[in-house]
Regions:
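Short S/T/G/P-rich N-terminal loop/turn motif that feeds into the first structured element of a domain
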Residues: 1-48, 58-66, 77-101
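Short arginine-rich
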Residues: 71-76
């Protein structure tokens, strides 16, 4: 497993319109090879949005970074200050706490 956390702020779009965009994009993400799950994030108090991506492995994440879906989101004019943090998973303690492995 490999974890990626992406955060950004909304620019010139309402949270309601953004939520509609997420609803429309969700089926496309469900079909991404190697993406085990995506958790969609929103904190309207801080204006921070994003997602936690659980990848089969780092290669799956890197393959996704070359897709049209990734590029359309990464360059979207209404997403500002996009950051990405990537992590390996520590399998031992993750299993103890019932995390996905």
């Amino acid at each position: 497993m490999y974890i990626q956390i992406i955060n950004f702020r909304l620019k010139d779009v309402s949270e309601e319109d953004y939520a509609g965009l997420c609803d429309n994009l969700a089926p496309s993400y469900a079909a991404v090879p190697g993406l085990v799950q995506k958790i969609w994030l929103a904190n309207s108090q801080t204006g921070t949005y994003g997602g936690v991506y659980v990848w089969r492995d780092k290669q799956a994440m890197e393959d996704f970074a070359r897709t049209d879906l990734f590029n359309s989101v990464a360059t979207h004019p209404n997403l500002d200050g996009v950051t990405s943090a990537e992590f390996d998973v520590l399998p031992g303690p993750t299993e103890v706490t019932n995390g996905l492995i």
